From Swiss-Prot:
Gene: cysG
Any one of the GO BP annotations: methylation
Uroporphyrinogen-III C-methyltransferase: annotated segments: 216-457
Binding site for S-adenosyl-L-methionine: 225, 301-303, 306, 331-332, 382, 411
Protein name as catalogued: Siroheme synthase
Length: 457
């Protein structure tokens, strides 16, 4: 180990930065965030330093470097574009046994600055020892996505509860189980972020007073339209905290590879006209797993509240008193249109968007007259088998036969396929495509030739 990772208490302690440019400014922000009493020495300063000095946040010393500036310092940073000056600052600091960082010269420095993930009071520092800063930055970005944004507030609140938890739970095992339950409670984290004192108190009392082997909870998570990169950060955090993941066929393998390795996986794949697992049985699976005290994630393609039957599943949980929450996802209409170069709205062509299911309940009928109107975009989910009927009904109700249409298969995935034409060809085009597919109808489809970007990569 070439470097010992430590966390320094710099609040109200003298620190020095030599340099007045952009690099020095980035270092100054970190020291100011840490509460340091900061002096900055340079021949000239960018405007941000002047603004900080005017606000009383730091002291500026304009002129050549003077070693006496180090006499009261705990820590120094050399951040100029003059290697000779940086070396001089480093040697002067070392002579006084003061740790000194030299920007972009780790061998000349007595300490290095890591990449930082700040969830105060929780702090994570990542370093490659100066050998590969880009790698350290990429790793930091990965870790950023895994740590909920409000985790620091939860950690701070947990510190306030330590005494009460120690009284409430007599064994270390009970306390550990309680803390695990608290740190994954999304409702508490959100309440703390919103400073909702009533919700904070209610959630805390519920967590403390309910049995540790309580009935669990269900989180409904939208996986997005296919590309794993479109999964939200909150969705990623939820699937990596799950005990059980219940998923359907629209969830890609790339997304399932992000699920916690030791989580149970329950496949309930569905498609229009054929259900591997009946919807009622899916509802009961969620209920049974939650009643075992497990943290269940119901992972659904797209957005769970847009033709995903998420509302029906949550009604079952609500009726049984099972706690639940929802993480929205990018719906197929948004993802498929963007990856096909088709804007859903455009000032010249469409002032509204209709999201329509092509898989109606028996006896259901759409308002075809309104759907046939101009200046709008129609997006049909699960409409492949009904394409000929959609074509017929829209033309019967006045939509021009030359209206542009597109069908997007496996939208946003590397296997995405798009075919376009006119409304009079819709039924024929649908026969060339496979499920899952999305039908887009409207003048905006005509922009595809100009705006298509994904198929060119």
């Amino acid at each position: 180990m070439d470097h010992l990772p430590i966390f320094c208490q710099l609040r109200d302690r003298d620190c020095l930065i030599v340099g007045g440019g952009d690099v020095a400014e980035r270092k100054a922000r970190l020291l100011l965030d840490a509460g340091a009493r900061l002096t900055v020495n340079a021949l000239a300063f960018i405007p941000q330093f002047t603004a900080w000095a005017d606000a009383g946040m730091l002291t500026l010393v304009e002129g050549p470097f003077d070693e006496s500036l180090l006499d009261t310092c705990w820590l120094a940073i050399a951040a100029t574009d003059d290697d000779t000056l940086n070396q001089r600052v480093s040697e002067a600091a070392e002579a006084r046994r003061i740790f000194c960082n030299v920007v972009d010269a780790p061998k000349a420095a007595s300490f290095i600055m890591p990449s930082i993930i700040d969830r105060s009071p929780l702090m994570v520092a990542v370093s490659s020892g100066g050998t590969s800063p880009v790698l350290a930055r990429l790793l930091r970005e990965k870790l950023e996505s895994l740590l909920p944004l409000h985790l620091g507030q939860v950690a701070k609140y947990a510190g306030q509860l330590r005494g009460r938890v120690k009284q409430q739970f007599t064994t270390m095992s009970e306390r550990r189980r309680f803390w695990e339950k608290l740190f994954v409670n999304d409702r508490l984290a959100q309440s703390l972020a919103n400073n909702d004192q009533k919700a904070i108190t209610e959630t805390t009392e519920q967590l403390i007073n309910e049995p540790l082997d309580h009935r669990g909870e269900v989180v409904l998570v939208g996986a997005g339209p296919g590309d794993a990169g479109l999964l939200t950060l909150k969705g990623l955090q939820q699937i990596q905290q799950a005990d059980v993941v219940v998923y359907d066929r629209l969830v890609s393998d790339d997304i399932m590879n992000l699920v916690r390795r030791d989580a149970d996986r329950v496949f309930v794949g569905k498609r229009a006209g054929y259900h591997c697992v009946p919807q009622e049985e899916i509802n009961q699976i969620l209920l049974r797993e939650a009643q075992k005290g497990k943290r269940v994630v119901r992972l659904k393609g797209g957005d769970p509240f847009i033709f995903g039957r998420g509302g029906e599943e949550l009604e079952t949980l609500c009726n049984a008193g099972i706690p639940f929450s929802v993480v929205p996802g990018i719906t197929a209409a948004s993802g498929c249109s963007a990856y096909s170069g088709i804007p859903l709205t455009h000032r010249d062509y469409a002032q509204s968007v209709r999201l329509i299911t092509g898989h109606l309940k028996t006896g259901g009928e759409l308002d075809w007259e309104n759907l046939a109107a101009e200046k709008q975009t129609l997006v049909f989910y699960m409409g492949l088998n009904q394409a000929a009927t959609i074509q017929q009904k829209l033309i019967e109700h006045g939509m021009p036969g030359e209206m542009p249409v597109a069908i997007v298969e496996n939208g946003t995935a590397v296997t995405q396929r798009v075919i376009d034409g006119t409304l009079t060809q819709l039924g024929e085009l649908a026969q060339q495509m496979n499920s899952p597919s999305l039908i887009i109808i409207g003048r905006v489809v005509g922009l595809r030739d100009k705006l298509n970007w994904f198929s060119n990569h």
